[in-house]
């Protein structure tokens, strides 16, 4: 599937937002502390801004995770320096540009079209990927984890630069330890999609499933939408509202992830004759499956 014109336009706006942020360089405005703190702010600002821009150019699912990871600390950096940049440093234009740019980048990073464009860019051959909605039970924990990780990543080096060595070392060690797990865990949210291929469909969701679940076209009897959970196996992970319900000619085996088994109180594998999943572009996915 080719990325649509509207998605391409949004991607260009996202790239332009990162370019504008780099041009505004609000981390230079923020650098009004001691020299070590200034160095941390400037190096960190350029590194995060460049990462956001490069990830929006080289479209990949990993890039989607990177954009989401760097957007949060950039929002914190820009908003925390608005007052000083405008009143003390007389940098009204730069700070206004930075605010608008990071607001656009943050908003676009959350949109379905940007997510789809970045996920689809990594597709193989004649396959169409539809990102899945984030299960409700994971939304708040994921947000809290990202906020905590962001706070540790930012405050650790700044505390060290400000010579608060005890607190700085402790927070930096926490940030380093978290870096081995948090990005990988958050990346799972970017690697959840329904794939439509000529041979059938694939549910690629290692947050909910232990193994990728593939259904061949010959085993598909019906595809429909539903407003909520029904008698079918719920493979959405706990999404509210509309979902795609797929009915099979013969029951097929689906292997659940450990956390899904605990939530459902069932065995590690189920034989399902119908199941539901929740792609963000629900109607588009159904139309593609019915072709």
What positions do the PLM features span?
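Hydrophobic core segments of alpha-helical transmembrane domains in multi-pass membrane proteins
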Residues: 41-48, 94-103, 168-177
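Membrane-anchoring hydrophobic segments
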Residues: 1-91
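Phosphoinositide-dependent membrane-docking surfaces
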Residues: 201-203, 212-230
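Terminal and domain-flanking low-complexity segments
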Residues: 83, 247-291
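N-terminal membrane-targeting/pre-transmembrane regions
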Residues: 1-11, 92-153
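Polybasic phosphoinositide-binding surfaces of eukaryotic membrane-targeting domains
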Residues: 192-204
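Short, surface-exposed polybasic-and-hydrophobic patches located at secondary-structure transitions
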Residues: 231-256
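Anionic N-terminal interaction surfaces
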Residues: 121-195
